[in-house]
């Protein structure tokens, strides 16, 4: 057997036999006896590790892998230190402490005792260790094994302690507040047996035992510098200074916090015990709190909406609602979707409205009409009873609210009819009459022919034409209503002292009727839209009861004139002057077939029809009507303007602010401004629907009708747009080129507007041109309602009075007109043209702007309140301002920076597209730019073709379904809002042309191509109009091209407004007009309904066309901007 020296010292090694006296013994398997281990050193044995020992002469099998068997190792190791019984092959059983085992599993027991043995060894000799070779061991048994023994009694961490009852103990003791005892003198010593010593005892012992007396003074006097407190003046000053300094330090919030922390109740902050509340009680409280918060939030939202109701709407959808102006408060809110045609009962000049209210008639109805016309889609009837008007008469406001038709769908809104003077006033608003803006003219038939001043409630329920763009105009409209024009007028219609006459009377509530004829017509943007656009008659001839074919007469006093208005619109071409005369009484009243909120299908259908009907210049039918209407309106406006000029000017300024608003807003703003400004003026000319009775009445209040008997309230919004278009258009139409291009129109309008508004009649009713109030006939402005979806042209037909080619002339003439507008009372020949804007859209907004400006006379900006409209409005406003003064042009504000956001008078009527430049805008030399001055800058040479491309939404998906989407209509429906409106707004606000207002849709430049309608798949209205300008002039905006995508925040310095003539002065001369190249004016109208993709095919190269043909790209700013 091998003996290892190691085994002597390492029992675990297998060990050598131990002597009888002890030590390490090795069990001999052969004779079952223990042999003492041999202490002499021998060959190193492997017993400690994996070595194999031999028992006797036999070679023991090696237990391999003992250490490799983790489970075995774990079990065996766990037994180390435990008492085990080892059963041997011989039958002997040993019991001892399991000490260790080797790699071959030789087992070492400590203090073994043989429990059972065949051959009993000497019992007196117990070895200290015995090593049992693996081959002799049968089994090992551990008895009474405690697996936790090794760790039992060890210190437990706090975590281990807390695990037992952490939050799980239910039998907690009831907590009781601590009571200090009766005297509060209880012993609060923590440990009475503290192993410490008392300092006083120390001092005593030192003194008594050691004779050492301590000098310690517990007063700490020796540790601080004693103060020499004296009565000297120096001490007092030093003390006061110290106290002041101390007070500053102590009053420091940080110092206070620290002191509170140090001196505060630490227990309450850090150690107090707080029982968790019952779960259900806690949940109930939380639920209540949540409900309270929700309720508060709803109330805040409601209040905010109510407050906003007085402000111009912010978004196309919302702005309509908001545009409801203060009507939010008084009138049901509109839904976000396309709003029903704006019945817009809003007392149009608040003053007028108030006055009518006294009469029990609401002139206000007209007020919104025009603006609504533009914004029609969005602003639902949002009966824009101006707050003033509404406030004045509860019933009226409720009627308006009803008219609003919360659904905002295109549907006729029925208003309660309020009998005025015993007559039922129905705001018949022809549904969707694109030109229907005139619908307003239901005149309260107080027996008052005009119904303006008297009870003739000319509820011009102007169902706003609903254009995709209309939303803006509506907003604008709402704004133009300006909360209550009466506010503007400083009272219900303080403007005309008489306005108050009706103040006390409730506004008659009207039902808005949709006229079937008008409904579909409203979208006819082509020449056919007469009934709607062209037709929104200003029932100029009282005697033409039949005229009102499109919309049932809103006869309130049986004023056929209202009925006639539509027909008369048609006739108005023939008898614009008649309208002027008649306008006084019936004109405003003729309800125009107004566009009511219509379904997408209707809109699409109208758009398609418009696309088909759209002609560059061919359609003259509606413009004439509008022209005549406008002349009347213009006359009225002029009259009103003359009277209200001062007020108008003020409002024009407001309008300027508003002008930044998107086209619809512009229209609305224009309208509002017109209403506001016109309010004094009576909105006669400017608020298309407003011109209601405004002709004669220079009401400051939007309800021009009330001021002057205006049976025909301005046709409602559609008309408003048309009217606006007419006004500006007519103003432009003087130039007769409105068809040319919206931009040009807008410019022209702006340019003309100031003058034309001065002499809006000049164009429209050239006879009326003189702003004499005497020409009472309010020409209803029937701006052809811009196509709902197709921004390009509703006025295409409108274009027409002047041959569409006149569009070219419109641009130049706009300048001329602008220059000459004031002088020319006889622009009426152009009225037809006027009716139509080249793009119709622009023209509409422009017209609206013009009308508003005209009404406002001093609100060029107001005119620009819509983006496009704004510019036109600005021009118009300038003109209007001028008109207001009579022939005197009003100085127009203009801002130099077209790109600047600030012209985002978004506050304006919920401008869906503030005219602020869109980031993608690509400045391009713009041939025709509308300058803030309102004068027309010959942006594109007259020969320049204008490309009217409907602008896609900013970032619209390739297939922009918006054309068909009514909901988008609210914002997208800004036909007018297209580039021109944006342009106009920018121009108006900044005084400098806006190069590219929004993301540019792919522009296809079709040089020299005659007007082309590009209908994006379903979006017929999306015509691209190529307006060849007669003159090749190019207006180069310096370097505009360099800033391709100016950010709205960064003005394009490159573009500086081309020379801007003052509204009074002639139109601006083109900054640069190289006759060599033909310029193409590319107008990107923002047509929400039109799919931008169709334009995608052509390359957008026109943006920067450095090549010969310069393309003027007016990018409409995205409405979202």
From Swiss-Prot:
According to the UniProt entry, its GO molecular function terms are: mRNA binding
Q: Ranges for the Sm domain?
A: 71-146
- Give the residues annotated as coiled coil: none
Q: Which Pfam families match?
A: LsmAD, SM-ATX
Mark out the compositionally biased spans (Gly residues): 12-22, 367-376, 434-448
Q: Biased composition, Polar residues: where in the chain? A: 27-36, 323-347, 476-487, 499-524
Q: Which GO terms describe its cellular component?
A: cytoplasm; cytoplasmic stress granule
Q: Where do the segments described as Disordered lie? A: 1-53, 270-376, 422-458, 476-935, 1039-1076
Return the Basic residues bias intervals.
Answer: 1-10
In which residue ranges is the amino acid composition biased (Pro residues)?
774-789, 914-926, 1048-1062
Phosphoserine modification sites are 219, 232
Q: Which domain of life is it from?
A: Eukaryota
**Protein localization:** Cytoplasm
Q: Where is the composition biased (Low complexity)?
A: 37-47, 552-596, 623-684, 697-711, 720-773, 807-825, 835-890
- Show the ranges annotated as biased composition (Basic and acidic residues): 274-310
Which keywords accompany this UniProt record? Cytoplasm, Developmental protein, Phosphoprotein
Any one of the GO BP annotations: stress granule assembly
Q: Which family does it belong to?
A: Belongs to the ataxin-2 family.
What does the function comment of this entry state? Regulator of actin filament formation, though it does not directly assemble with actin filaments. Required for oocyte specification and oocyte positioning in the female germline. Also required for normal eye development and bristle morphology.
Entry protein name: Ataxin-2 homolog
């Amino acid at each position: 057997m091998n003996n290892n020296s190691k085994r002597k010292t390492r029992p675990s090694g297998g060990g050598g036999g131990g002597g009888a006296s002890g030590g390490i013994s090795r069990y001999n398997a052969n004779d079952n006896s223990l042999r003492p281990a041999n202490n002499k050193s021998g060959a190193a044995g492997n017993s400690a590790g994996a070595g194999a020992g031999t028992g006797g002469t036999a070679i023991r099998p090696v237990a391999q892998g003992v250490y490799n068997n983790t489970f075995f190792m774990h079990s065996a190791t766990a037994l180390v230190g435990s008492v085990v019984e080892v059963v041997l092959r011989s039958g002997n059983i040993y019991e001892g402490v399991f000490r260790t085992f080797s790699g071959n599993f030789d087992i070492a027991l400590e203090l073994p005792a043989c429990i059972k043995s065949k051959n009993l060894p000497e019992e007196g000799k117990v070895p200290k260790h015995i090593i049992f070779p693996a081959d002799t061991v049968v089994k090992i048994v551990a008895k009474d094994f405690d697996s936790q023994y090794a760790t039992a009694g060890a210190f437990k961490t706090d975590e281990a302690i807390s695990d037992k009852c952490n939050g799980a103990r239910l039998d907690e003791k009831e907590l009781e507040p601590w009571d200090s005892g009766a005297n509060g003198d209880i012993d609060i010593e923590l440990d009475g047996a503290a192993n410490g010593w008392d300092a006083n005892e120390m001092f005593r012992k030192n003194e008594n035992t050691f004779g050492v007396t301590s000098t310690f003074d517990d007063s700490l006097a020796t540790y601080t510098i004693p103060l020499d407190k004296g009565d000297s003046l120096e001490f007092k000053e030093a003390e006061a200074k110290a106290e002041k300094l101390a007070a500053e330090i102590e009053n420091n919030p940080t110092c206070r916090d620290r002191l509170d922390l140090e001196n505060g109740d630490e227990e309450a902050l850090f150690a107090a015990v707080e029982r968790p509340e019952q779960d259900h009680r806690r949940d109930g409280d939380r639920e209540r709190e949540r409900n309270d918060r929700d309720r508060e939030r709803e109330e805040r939202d409601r209040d905010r909406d109510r407050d906003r109701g007085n402000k111009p709407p912010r978004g196309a959808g919302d702005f309509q609602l908001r545009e409801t102006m203060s009507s939010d408060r008084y009138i049901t809110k509109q839904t976000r979707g396309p709003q029903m045609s704006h019945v817009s009962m809003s007392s149009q000049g608040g003053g007028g409205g108030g006055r009518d209210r006294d009469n029990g008639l609401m002139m206000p109805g007209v007020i919104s009409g025009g603006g609504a016309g533009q914004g029609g889609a969005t602003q639902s009837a949002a009966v824009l009873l101006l707050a003033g008007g509404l406030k004045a008469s509860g019933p009226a406001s409720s009627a308006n609210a009803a008219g609003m038709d919360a659904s905002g769908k295109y549907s006729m809104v029925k208003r309660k009819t309020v009998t005025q003077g015993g007559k039922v006033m129905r705001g018949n608003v022809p549904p969707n009459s694109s030109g229907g803006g005139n619908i307003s003219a239901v005149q309260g038939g107080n027996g008052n022919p005009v119904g303006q001043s008297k009870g003739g409630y000319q509820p011009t329920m102007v169902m706003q034409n609903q254009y995709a763009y209309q939303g803006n105009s509506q907003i604008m409209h709402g704004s133009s209503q300006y909360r209550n024009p009466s506010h503007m007028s400083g009272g219900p219609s303080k403007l005309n002292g008489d306005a108050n006459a009706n103040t006390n009377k409730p506004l008659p509530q009207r039902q808005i009727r949709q006229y079937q004829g008008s409904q579909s017509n409203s979208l006819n943007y082509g020449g056919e839209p007469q009934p709607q656009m062209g037709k929104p008659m200003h029932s100029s001839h009282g005697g033409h009861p039949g005229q009102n074919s499109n919309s049932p007469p809103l006869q309130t006093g049986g004023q056929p004139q209202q009925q006639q208005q539509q027909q008369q619109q048609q006739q108005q071409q023939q008898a614009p002057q008649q309208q002027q005369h008649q306008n006084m009484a019936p004109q405003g009243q003729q309800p125009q077939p107004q566009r009511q909120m219509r379904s997408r299908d209707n809109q699409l259908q109208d758009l398609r029809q418009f696309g088909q009907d759209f002609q560059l210049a061919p359609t003259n039918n509606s413009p004439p009507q509008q022209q005549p209407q406008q002349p009347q309106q213009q006359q009225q406006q002029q009259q009103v303007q003359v009277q209200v000029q001062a007020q108008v000017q003020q409002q024009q300024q407001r309008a300027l602010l508003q002008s930044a608003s998107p086209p619809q807003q512009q229209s609305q703003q224009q309208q509002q401004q017109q209403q506001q400004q016109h309010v004094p003026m009576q909105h006669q000319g400017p608020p298309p629907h407003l011109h209601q009775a405004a002709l004669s009445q220079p009401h400051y209040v939007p309800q021009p009708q009330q001021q002057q008997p205006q049976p025909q309230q301005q046709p409602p919004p559609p008309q408003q747009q048309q009217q606006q278009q007419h006004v500006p258009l007519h103003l432009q139409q003087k130039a007769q080129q409105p068809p040319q291009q919206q931009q040009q129109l807008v410019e022209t309008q702006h340019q003309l507007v100031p003058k034309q508004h001065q002499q809006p009649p000049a164009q429209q009713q050239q006879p009326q041109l003189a702003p004499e109030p005497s020409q009472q006939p309010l020409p209803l402005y029937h701006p052809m309602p811009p196509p709902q979806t197709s921004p390009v042209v509703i006025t295409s037909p409108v274009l027409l009075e002047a041959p569409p080619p006149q569009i070219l002339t419109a641009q130049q003439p706009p300048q001329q007109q602008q220059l000459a507008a004031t002088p020319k009372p006889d622009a009426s020949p152009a009225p037809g043209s006027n009716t139509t804007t080249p793009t119709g859209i622009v023209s509409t907004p422009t017209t609206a702007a013009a009308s508003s400006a005209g009404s406002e006379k001093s609100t060029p900006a107001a005119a620009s309140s819509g983006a496009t409209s704004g510019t036109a409005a600005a021009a118009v406003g300038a003109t209007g301002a001028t008109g207001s003064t009579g022939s005197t042009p009003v100085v127009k504000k203009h801002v130099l920076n077209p790109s600047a956001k600030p012209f985002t008078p978004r506050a304006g009527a919920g401008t869906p597209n503030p005219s602020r430049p869109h980031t993608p805008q690509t400045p391009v030399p713009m041939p025709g730019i509308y300058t803030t001055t309102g004068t027309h800058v010959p942006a594109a040479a007259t020969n320049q073709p204008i490309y009217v491309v409907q602008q896609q939404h900013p970032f619209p998906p390739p297939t922009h379904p918006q054309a068909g989407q009514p909901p988008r209509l609210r914002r997208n429906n800004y036909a007018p809002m297209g580039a021109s409106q944006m342009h106009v707004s920018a121009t108006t606000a900044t005084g400098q042309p806006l190069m590219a207002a929004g993301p540019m849709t792919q522009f296809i430049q079709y040089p020299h191509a005659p007007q082309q309608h590009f209908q994006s798949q379903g979006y017929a209205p999306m015509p691209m109009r190529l307006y060849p300008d007669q003159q090749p002039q190019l207006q180069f905006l310096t370097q505009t091209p360099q800033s391709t995508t100016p950010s709205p925040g960064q003005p394009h310095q490159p573009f500086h407004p081309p020379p801007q003539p003052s509204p009074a002065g002639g139109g601006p001369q083109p900054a640069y007009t190289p006759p060599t190249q033909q310029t193409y004016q590319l107008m990107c109208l923002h047509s929400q309904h039109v799919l931008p993709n169709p334009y995608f095919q052509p390359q957008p190269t026109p943006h920067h066309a450095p090549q010969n043909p310069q393309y003027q790209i007016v990018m409409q700013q995205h409405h979202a901007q």
